[in-house]
């Protein structure tokens, strides 16, 4: 009888540890996923601004050259 209680208690402790472990890993995964999504969105917007600026810069230069030709 006592061994069954010990076995039950060890199973409960293992299940508690396992559930805490799984929840911790799941939470860390979600946090890293959020950080990754936010960082990629930030760098994507930064990249779009740079390409837009370069496009405007080249557009101004081409207009300048066209104005000098005529």
From Swiss-Prot:
Regions that span the bilayer: 12-32
Superkingdom of source: Eukaryota
Membrane topology classification: Single-pass membrane protein
GO cellular component: membrane
Localization per Swiss-Prot or TrEMBL: Membrane
Main localisation: membrane
Alphabetical keyword list: Membrane, Transmembrane, Transmembrane helix
Keyword Transmembrane: yes
Name this polypeptide is given: Uncharacterized protein YKL183C-A
Organism in which the protein naturally occurs: Saccharomyces cerevisiae (strain ATCC 204508 / S288c)
């Amino acid at each position: 009888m006592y061994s069954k209680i010990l076995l039950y208690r060890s199973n409960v402790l293992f299940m508690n540890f396992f559930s805490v472990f799984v929840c911790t890993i799941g939470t860390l995964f979600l946090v890293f996923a959020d950080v990754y999504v936010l960082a990629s969105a930030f760098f994507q917007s930064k990249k779009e601004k740079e390409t837009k600026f370069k496009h405007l810069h080249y557009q101004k230069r081409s207009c300048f050259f066209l104005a000098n030709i005529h």
